[in-house]
């Protein structure tokens, strides 16, 4: 939701400002990486509000660097690896840091709760990435572009930005612990839905042959 409906306009203006000033996409990605580390450290210390500022800044810059690369035609293999590598690796570290920071913020969990919540989030994160890889390899397309409902689901599924919305909302009501529990529950629910989605797609391919994106039929 944030990437599609909130960031496009400010990212457009940021790109238009940066492009003629010699700012490269890799420079933007580097700043985003710094924001990622700062968010992790602040979450770990229980400074959730400050951490969220840097986390949301990172998500914004993650949008800007791609637009800047396309606008200036300066994309590179290294830049692509750098950008996507950060995107792939950092979310689990944020969730772990948030969980560990709850104690410093006065919301300590017992060990059982900690591991159930973190296990659900990290397990769901890894399995969802595997589902995505299976879809690309066996179906020949990314699952979220198969049907309109899949594209819509992509906007709210348990990925970084929707999860940040849950964490931000929980902080606004003064219960950052509830936010991470909400992320765990939403991750498990989305994992089940993604599993059903993948099974439907595999069955459709066996029945109909090669699948195509609904976008190509428009």
Positions of the model-derived regions?
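A feature for the membrane-embedded catalytic helix bundles of lipid/isoprenoid biosynthetic enzymes
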Residues: 1-15, 84-218
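A short mid-domain helix/strand-loop element embedded in enzyme catalytic domains
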Residues: 4-12, 17-20, 27-29, 35-36
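Short amphipathic alpha-helical coupling elements at transmembrane boundaries
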Residues: 12-20, 66, 70, 80, ...
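Membrane-embedded alpha-helical segments that form the functional core of polytopic membrane enzymes
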Residues: 26-78
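Hydrophobic/aromatic residues within transmembrane alpha-helices of membrane transport systems
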Residues: 24, 53-56, 62, 83, ...
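Alpha-helical transmembrane segments of multipass membrane proteins
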Residues: 17, 37-41, 167-169
């Amino acid at each position: 939701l944030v990437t599609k409906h909130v960031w496009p306009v400010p990212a457009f203006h940021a790109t238009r400002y940066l492009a003629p000033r010699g700012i490269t996409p890799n420079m933007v990605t580097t700043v985003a990486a710094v924001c990622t580390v700062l968010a992790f450290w602040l979450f770990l210390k229980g400074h959730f509000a400050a951490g969220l500022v840097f986390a949301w800044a990172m998500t914004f810059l993650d949008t800007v660097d791609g637009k800047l690369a396309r606008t200036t035609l300066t994309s590179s293999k290294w830049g692509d690896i750098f950008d996507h590598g950060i995107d792939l690796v950092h979310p689990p570290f944020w969730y772990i840091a948030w969980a560990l920071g709850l104690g410093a913020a006065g919301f300590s969990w017992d060990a059982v709760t900690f591991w159930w919540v973190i296990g659900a989030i990290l397990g769901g994160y890894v399995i969802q990435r595997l589902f995505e890889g299976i879809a690309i390899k066996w179906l020949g397309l990314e699952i979220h572009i198969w049907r309109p409902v899949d594209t819509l689901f992509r906007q709210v599924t348990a990925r970084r930005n929707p999860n940040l919305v849950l964490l931000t909302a929980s902080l606004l009501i003064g219960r950052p612990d509830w936010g991470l529990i909400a992320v765990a529950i939403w991750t498990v629910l989305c994992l089940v839905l993604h599993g059903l989605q993948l099974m439907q797609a595999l069955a459709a391919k066996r029945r109909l042959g090669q699948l195509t994106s609904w976008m190509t039929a428009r």
